[in-house]
């Protein structure tokens, strides 16, 4: 059985003009909204991100004498013990935190489904855009990137934009030579750039607009798509079909909602 393919329009950056078509499994961005699945995935990510390193001193860890501070009777006040008592200044912390592991477990299929649901929700709401590689600016100027964001109604005023790029963009040499990443260092209030290896379900949900480059999207599809969907495909998820923007088979008019954003 041959899996149906979904044709997504891929856009150039920073002009956001249609450039070519990008093929993914048809069911990948058509998952039904499930709030319970998303909740489980977000809690799972938050639990695993907790460091669990908080540590306070108990009574046996306080450096002080074990001598009783006052005699038991005759003072007219409540009886007291030694200086390590939790009710005294400089004393121990009663029932305080100790290093522990907060991580929880979640089935891989459930987490993969949550990622597909999150991306499907952004796709249905026209908040997901696929970008064509390479992604760069003419100059490493913050002013230029800010003008691009305002031109396309992006940024804090319209919802912070998230750019998910291939891990190669964040290597030492690429990071120094990429004008886009250099220009974005002072615009954390308006946009964020993360490698696809750090992309989580929370990231797909909390940002106003989501931009993913085609190479990163191929990795996401390969990792989170259903196994039977990938095995039934005639072509691998990373294979793309280029279409000349000037040809009759591709128009620059607004694409249909069922095909692209």
From Swiss-Prot:
Family annotation (Gene3D superfamilies): 3.40.1370.10
GO (cellular component) term, any one: mitochondrion
Stretches the record annotates as Disordered: 72-101
Main subcellular localisation: mitochondrion
Top-level taxon: Eukaryota
An example Gene Ontology molecular-function term: structural constituent of ribosome
Compartments, as annotated in UniProt: Mitochondrion
Biological process, per Gene Ontology: mitochondrial translation
Presequence positions on this chain: 1-35
Pfam families named in the record: Ribosomal_L4
Record's keyword terms, sorted: Mitochondrion, Ribonucleoprotein, Ribosomal protein, Transit peptide
Oligomeric form and interacting partners: Component of the mitochondrial large ribosomal subunit (mt-LSU). Mature yeast 74S mitochondrial ribosomes consist of a small (37S) and a large (54S) subunit. The 37S small subunit contains a 15S ribosomal RNA (15S mt-rRNA) and at least 32 different proteins. The 54S large subunit contains a 21S rRNA (21S mt-rRNA) and at least 45 different proteins.
Role noted for this protein: Component of the mitochondrial ribosome (mitoribosome), a dedicated translation machinery responsible for the synthesis of mitochondrial genome-encoded proteins, including at least some of the essential transmembrane subunits of the mitochondrial respiratory chain. The mitoribosomes are attached to the mitochondrial inner membrane and translation products are cotranslationally integrated into the membrane.
Family that this chain belongs to: Belongs to the universal ribosomal protein uL4 family.
Protein name: Large ribosomal subunit protein uL4m
